[in-house]
Swiss-Prot record:
Location(s), subcellular: Cell membrane
Protein keywords: Cell membrane, Membrane, Transmembrane, Transmembrane helix
MF-aspect GO terms: transmembrane transporter activity
Source organism: Mycobacterium bovis (strain ATCC BAA-935 / AF2122/97)
Pfam families in alphabetical order: MFS_1
Protein name in the entry: Uncharacterized protein Mb2288
Highest taxon listed in the record's lineage: Bacteria
Primary location: membrane
Transmembrane regions: 18-38, 47-67, 100-120, 159-179, 180-200, 232-252, 260-280, 302-322, 355-375, 380-400
InterPro entries for this protein: MFS, MFS_trans_sf, Uncharacterized_MFS-type
CC per GO annotation: plasma membrane
């Protein structure tokens, strides 16, 4: 019993998991790969699909914006609730199920309001599963290495992110732009993702057993989302400032086409190449973090500076290089940047931390997108100066962070 007599503690590691940590991470990564085929495939045609039902540009912008806000902002709710219930598998399965069900239905939605609701519901599914999923993964990553575990998961995710849009594009070409079969075929990878996830839950019902540290059991009272370590908040500040100076691919692609650097048909090809850079850099940064520690993250602000120096020129080679650098930065953001949270926050409050971190990351990304877009309209030279200033501030803040890193076994 705990000191107050109402919270039981147990030492994790008393029961050996049925799967090795690396196998758990790999299988979880395959689940993410299959799920990415589903929702990245759907997201690649969300705009045209809504337009086919009569949506205006404003409607598309509002619906997709609300969806992304829900995907990140609702984690402030789902994270603490997952910590309170300790039912991380249930939250993860529920979130994936919502995504797998809504995407095929989107293809047969006969009314605009139904399609809009399904687009938002799919993003809510990501909010439901996000903190719980990252918490489950963080336990196994304590053995593989935080950086390596999250990096392998992200690399597999990106394979799915490339396969999904290509699958949908192929189906549209075969069926003459029929959305129902193009999205209906995604039922197959979606069903496989859920089946594999349920199998993984049965094999490793308590992934926290990978960690050799005390953990709260039972049904503890809800952790206060704001009662998190000071170093965690400093890390959130570093992340926010970094993202304020990071442009979106939407703006990069706008520049490519509006300045006549690339034909519109070539933009998806460049994006696919950026996703390949994402996967490779995620692996490299993850392994580097486990070996060298926090200084690995110094690369992220530097990459953000290189993006604006290269991607907003009128030279096709420079723009392509800048886009590949953008993909590399995203790879670090989606892997190592998330993995560090687990080294800063103990298991009982980790889902809450992931919820807060994701919400802050989303707000900073949205703010950064608006800031970069506004500066782009004013002057590219001004944009470069402001981004350099922001990223230098982020570097200073990063070196003030003390990370109690857990070495891989």
């Amino acid at each position: 019993m705990g000191a107050n007599g109402d919270v039981a503690l147990s030492r994790i590691g008393a029961t050996r998991p049925a799967l090795s940590a690396w196998r758990f991470v790999t299988v979880f990564g395959v689940v993410g790969l299959l799920a990415d085929v589903v929702y990245e495939g759907a997201r690649s045609i969300t705009g045209p699909l809504l337009a086919s039902l009569g949506a205006t540009g404003l409607v598309v912008g509002v619906v997709t914006g609300v969806g992304e806000a829900a995907a990140l902002g609702l984690r402030l709710v789902s994270g603490p609730l997952a910590d309170r219930s300790r039912r991380f598998w249930a939250w993860t399965i529920a979130g994936y199920t919502l995504t797998v069900v809504t995407v095929p239905l989107l293809g047969i939605a006969g009314a605009l309001w139904v399609a809009c609701a399904l687009v938002i519901a799919e993003r809510v599914g990501k909010a439901v599963r996000g903190p719980a999923k990252d918490t489950l993964l963080s336990h196994a990553a304590s053995v593989t290495g935080r950086g390596r575990g999250f990096a392998v998961h992200e690399a597999l995710d990106q394979v799915g992110a490339m396969i999904g849009p290509l699958t949908v594009a192929g189906m549209l070409a075969i069926t003459g732009n029929a959305y129902a079969p193009a999205l209906g075929v995604l039922t197959l990878p979606g069903g496989a993702a859920l089946a594999l996830l349920l199998w993984l839950q049965r094999r490793v019902p308590r992934p926290e057993s990978y960690e050799d540290c005390p953990v709260v059991l039972g049904n503890p009272s809800a952790p206060r989302p704001w009662a998190l370590p000071a170093q965690f908040w400093l890390y959130c500040g570093f992340t926010a400032i970094t993202m304020l100076g990071f442009g979106t691919f939407g703006l990069l692609s706008f520049h490519m086409v509006s300045h006549g650097v690339l034909a519109a048909a070539m933009v998806p090809v460049v994006y696919a190449a950026a996703m390949a850079a994402d996967a490779l850099t995620a692996l490299a940064s993850g392994f580097s973090y486990d070996r060298y520690g926090a200084k690995t993250l110094a690369v992220l602000p530097i990459l953000s500076i290189l993006v604006v120096l290269f991607a907003f020129t009128d030279n096709v080679t420079m723009v392509v290089i800048g886009t590949l650098v953008w993909g590399a930065a995203v790879g670090i953001q989606e892997s190592t940047l998330r993995g560090v949270v687990a080294d800063l926050v103990a298991s009982p409050r980790r889902a809450s931390a992931y919820g807060v971190f994701a919400a802050g990351l989303g707000a900073a990304t949205a703010g950064g997108g608006a800031l970069i877009g506004w500066l782009y309209d004013i002057s590219i030279g001004t944009l470069v100066v402001v981004v350099i200033a922001l990223e230098l501030m982020a570097l200073v803040m990063m070196f003030a962070i003390r990370l109690p890193r857990v070495a891989p076994s």
